[in-house]
Amino acid sequence: MNTQLSRTQFQFQPFHLVTPSPWPLLTSFALLILTSAAVMYFNGYANPLGGSGALLVGIGLATTVAAMALWFRDVVAEGTFLGDHTILVQKGITMGVALFIISEVFFFISVFWAFFHSSLSPTVELGAQWPPVGIATINPFELPLLNTILLLSSGATVTYAHHSVIEGNRRGAILGTLMTLIFAVLFTICQGIEYLNAGFTIADGVFGSTFFFSTGFHGVHVIIGTLFIAVAFFRMLSYHLTDHHHLGFEASILYWHFVDVVWLFLFISVYWWGS
C-alpha cells in the first residue's frame, strides 16, 4: 500500500500531459466572431447586433485577446511555477516554434511569388510595364527606409536583451526589451501613416492588392511579435526569467528576427525594385 501511494507522487515520463482546458475552444469561437465580423464589415453588411459594423469587430478582437491572455496565463503557470516544462518539453516547444516559422516562410514565398509573377511579366492590361500605368508609387527612401532602420534597430536591441538575460544583466535585459518595444510601436505607427498617405488602394489592380497584402500581412506579424515580446517583458519585470530558463523570450526573439528578414525582402523587392 505504501509503495502504491509513493508511486503516485512521481512522474515516470518527461512529457507534459496537458490538463483539459477551455481556452483553445473559446479562442476558436472568438476568432470565428472576429473573422466573420471583419468580412461583414469590409463588405458593408449591417451589424446584426445593431450599431456600427466596427462594434462587432471590436467585440471579436476583445474576446480573442481575453481568451488568449487567459490561455497564456495557464501556460506561464505550468512552465514557471509548476515545473511542467522539462528539458524535453522545452526541446519540443523549440521545434514547434521552428516548424511554425518555416511554415510562415513558405507562406511569404507564395506572397513574393504572386508579386514577381505580375511584375516580371506585366500584362497588356497593366500597360505592359511595372508599376502599372497610373500608379503613383511610394518613395522607398522616405518612410520605408525609416521603417527599415527602426526594424533593424529593434533586432539589435532584442539581441542585446537576450545576451543580457544570459549574462544575468537584468538592467540591460529590461532596457533592451523596452527599446525593442518602442521601435516596434514606432514601426507600426509609420506603417499606418504610410497607408493613409498612399496614392493607391488595395483595389487598384494587382499592384495595390499585392502591395497591401504583403506589407499588411507583415504588419500583422509585427503586431503579433510586439505582443509576444511585451509578454516576455512583463514576465521579465516579474522575475519569471532566469539565465537558463527563458524559453518564451527566446521564441519571441526567433519570431522577431524572422519578421526582420521578411521586411528586408519586402523593402528591396516591393518598395525599391518594385517602384
Swiss-Prot record:
Main localization, broad class: mitochondrion
Transmembrane segments: 22-42, 52-72, 96-116, 132-152, 173-193, 211-231, 253-273
Top-rank taxon: Eukaryota
Stated role: Component of the cytochrome c oxidase, the last enzyme in the mitochondrial electron transport chain which drives oxidative phosphorylation. The respiratory chain contains 3 multisubunit complexes succinate dehydrogenase (complex II, CII), ubiquinol-cytochrome c oxidoreductase (cytochrome b-c1 complex, complex III, CIII) and cytochrome c oxidase (complex IV, CIV), that cooperate to transfer electrons derived from NADH and succinate to molecular oxygen, creating an electrochemical gradient over the inner membrane that drives transmembrane transport and the ATP synthase.
Localization of this protein: Mitochondrion inner membrane
Family: Belongs to the cytochrome c oxidase subunit 3 family.
Keywords assigned by UniProt, alphabetized: Membrane, Mitochondrion, Mitochondrion inner membrane, Translocase, Transmembrane, Transmembrane helix
Subunit (UniProt): Component of the cytochrome c oxidase (complex IV, CIV), a multisubunit enzyme composed of a catalytic core of 3 subunits and several supernumerary subunits. The complex exists as a monomer or a dimer and forms supercomplexes (SCs) in the inner mitochondrial membrane with ubiquinol-cytochrome c oxidoreductase (cytochrome b-c1 complex, complex III, CIII).
Record-level GO BP terms: mitochondrial electron transport, cytochrome c to oxygen
EC number: 7.1.1.9
Keyword Endoplasmic reticulum among UniProt keywords: no
InterPro entries given in the database record: Cyt_c/ubiquinol_Oxase_su3, Cyt_c_oxase_su3_dom, Cyt_c_oxidase-like_su3, Cyt_c_oxidase_su3-like_sf, Cyt_c_oxidase_su3_a-hlx
Pfam families the UniProt entry points to: COX3 (PF00510)
Signal sequence bounds: none
GO molecular function annotation: cytochrome-c oxidase activity
Reactions catalysed according to its record: 4 Fe(II)-[cytochrome c] + O2 + 8 H(+)(in) = 4 Fe(III)-[cytochrome c] + 2 H2O + 4 H(+)(out)
Entry's Gene Ontology cellular component terms: mitochondrial inner membrane; mitochondrion
Topological category with respect to the lipid bilayer: Multi-pass membrane protein
Protein name: Cytochrome c oxidase subunit 3
Gene name of this polypeptide: COX3
